[in-house]
Amino acid sequence: MNKFKGNKVVLIGNGAVGSSYAFSLVNQSIVDELVIIDLDTEKVRGDVMDLKHATPYSPTTVRVKAGEYSDCHDADLVVICAGAAQKPGETRLDLVSKNLKIFKSIVGEVMASKFDGIFLVATNPVDILVYATWKFSGLPKERVIGSGTILDSARFRLLLSEAFDVAPRSVDAQIIGEHGDTELPVWSHANIAGQPLKTLLEQRPEGKAQIEQIFVQTRDAAYDIIQAKGATYYGVAMGLARITEAIFRNEDAVLTVSALLEGEYDEEDVYIGVPAVINRNGIRNVVEIPLNDEEQSKFAHSAKTLKDIMAEAEELK
């Protein structure tokens, strides 16, 4: 860990997601030092200059520079946004083989620097790539985190807040499972401004069809955005910044991230989106929400989908 300086993040991958995350960190002054690594060194040079020019208006000064893998040796957090991008019509799981090869190289380079901090992975398919990062790095599971369903849960809360005309922060509802097509909403524990969703729906019979559509919109949002503008990046960048903030401020915040399960939710040896307590040490523990039978069945299906894909991946054997 970075014992002698302020909080240091090394960002690997300066594409749309990575550069949006970098801007979020600087804009909110979440870090003291940000190092950016990418094969496109000229774009990194330009972004570093641009971000530096923004720092006079950030709450506190953030040091930003272009770097190399050797800069990871004293980093508190290495965030990986590098990898092949998702194309229109392509699922996140289609990206597996391409990105596993990329990650084996990246994680090897990071660990060669004597890195001893926390990994945060955003590249898709995130649940599989964070599992690969854990395997390739040899770090404890607590210090390898995936962005998981943090963005899906944010989309879900936003749409529910609009349906019930309250602020998103007044909605407590989670999307869990794979960050992808098999994810599921935890309807049984959703509440709006402290009122159980089930109770509210009893007062609005027409609302059941509406909330089912809300989940479909949540699940398919990425495809809609990719079709419209080629990629999603602002939402996930803010989600990554939120996880980073929870780590550096030692918040013990509960966020829906991709964490390794070891018996929780009746699953083993799979990274998947679940609520977890996040603090300076990474994942303190997984929060096990009691699911109803339907939710448990869907969660098991989601986990099996990921396990089946990993079983076919030569890089993980």
Curated annotation (Swiss-Prot):
Q: Gene for this protein?
A: ldh1
**Reactions accelerated catalytically:** (S)-lactate + NAD(+) = pyruvate + NADH + H(+)
Keyword NAD appears in the UniProt entry: yes
Can you name this protein? Answer: L-lactate dehydrogenase 1
A GO MF term: L-lactate dehydrogenase activity
Source organism's superkingdom? Bacteria
Tell me the residue numbers annotated for binding substrate.
Q86, R92, N124, P125, V126, D127, D152, S153, A154, R155, T232
- Give the main EC class: oxidoreductase
Modified sites of kind Phosphotyrosine: Y223
